[in-house]
Design a protein with these regions (language model features):
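Short, solvent-exposed coil/turn linker segments
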Residues: 2, 83-84, 223
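C-terminal non-catalytic accessory extensions
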Residues: 196-264
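Hydrophobic transmembrane alpha-helical segments that form the core helix bundle
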Residues: 1-72, 92-196, 212
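Interfacial helix-loop-helix junctions of multi-pass membrane proteins
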Residues: 45-49, 81-86
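Short acidic (Asp/Glu) and glycine-rich catalytic loops that position anionic groups and cofactors
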Residues: 78-82, 209
Length: 264
């Protein structure tokens, strides 16, 4: 009933503002989001653009400025955090839908229920505990994106510099390939990854560790103490590799924590 009233009220407002032309304006408003979001985004948004997060689907951000379709241009962000009212995730991204939501909040006409994972960082070093586990599970997609950027990226770059011509050809664009969710790997990509891992032992180590960390997150339905035990075992294994990029990533894991709930 509420949505029907909204649609009817919008028609009346358009008729008041634009006269008979308001019917055309209203019709465009009614089909704009369903047509572009459901029709265009679910097609183009799975084949063209870039990915911030390795969600287990082929979703992509078509363009960093979400201006025309309520921010749905940031489709990969939306698929990764489907309950979030805010679709922009990077400093260079803009979500027009979030802009209007914040404006309505400022005017006291709306309130935000969710805008993504509720996680904070504390740079003071401390041992891993269950609070870290909850925070890491909550923000696991961003954690894995960080692993790709700060571990896989630098190591692949260093190995590329040391490689011969054939090795460089194989390692070109390897950083993105080595971060892709296994569900999305076709036969050709799997073969290329196998060749990379056979050629370079160091890259094989960080790739295997990435897969093992993904397995830790898959235990999120288990008791938190079990997940903590698995995470500590992964950390111990990663530290044993004595790789600087890995060490820095491992140290960052204990900085994630869940904020205290707002009791006001």
């Amino acid at each position: 009933v509420g949505s029907e009233m909204c649609i009817r009220d919008r028609l009346m407002i358009n008729l008041f503002l634009f006269g008979f032309l308001g019917v055309t304006v209203w019709a465009i408003q009614m089909i704009w989001i369903p047509f572009f979001a459901a029709g265009i985004i679910n097609g183009v948004g799975h084949s063209v653009g870039y990915r911030n997060f390795e969600s287990p689907d082929a979703s992509r951000n078509i363009f960093p400025l979400g201006l025309l379709i309520g921010g749905e241009e940031l489709h990969n962000n939306h698929h990764t955090y489907p309950n979030s009212a805010k679709l922009s995730r990077k400093a260079y991204e803009f979500d027009i839908g979030w802009f209007w939501i914040k404006l309505f909040c400022f005017m006291g006409m709306a309130s935000v229920v969710s805008q993504g994972p509720v996680v904070q960082r504390n740079q003071k070093k401390k041992p891993l505990d269950s609070d870290n586990v909850w925070a890491l599970l909550n923000d696991r997609f961003n954690v894995m994106a960080t692993y790709s950027e700060e571990v896989i990226g630098p190591i692949v770059k260093a190995e590329y510099i040391k490689a011969d011509k054939q090795g460089r050809r194989l390692l070109k664009k390897a950083r993105k390939l080595l971060a892709v969710d296994e569900i999305l790997l076709d036969r050709g990509k799997r073969l290329k990854i196998s060749r990379i891992l056979e050629m370079n032992a160091k890259i094989k180590i960080i790739y295997d560790l990435r897969l093992e960390l993904e397995e830790v997150w898959k235990q999120r339905g288990n008791d938190v103490t079990e997940v903590l035990t698995s995470l500590k075992a992964w950390v111990e294994k990663a530290e044993s590799k004595q790789e600087r990029a890995l060490d820095e990533f491992v140290q960052s894991l204990s900085t994630y924590y869940m904020p205290e709930p707002n009791k006001s």
